[in-house]
């Protein structure tokens, strides 16, 4: 896995998500790729914030899109999906994951 491959995969996923859910989709990369200490077989951790209510069906749509990108680019993508309403709430701000992503996350 190299940086160019990672960037192409992330942009491809972002394009598919915007096509499906609209221009207000937000992506943040976190974990080893964001820190720059990833290895050849690391996964790409991506927070997906959507402008719609997130339920199981919506999550499945995101996971399916990510899976298609995984197959195309030969990478592993770990997605976490939240609605914009939840992600920008006090409840989300109390989560350790939120704090980690705020600290090291990179907007795409």
Where do the PLM segments sit?
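Catalytic core of pol beta-like nucleotidyltransferases
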Residues: 1-25, 35-40, 51-108
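P-loop (Walker A) phosphate-binding loop of NTP-binding proteins
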Residues: 32
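Short beta-strand->loop micro-motif that forms the acidic, two-metal-ion catalytic signature
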Residues: 45-49
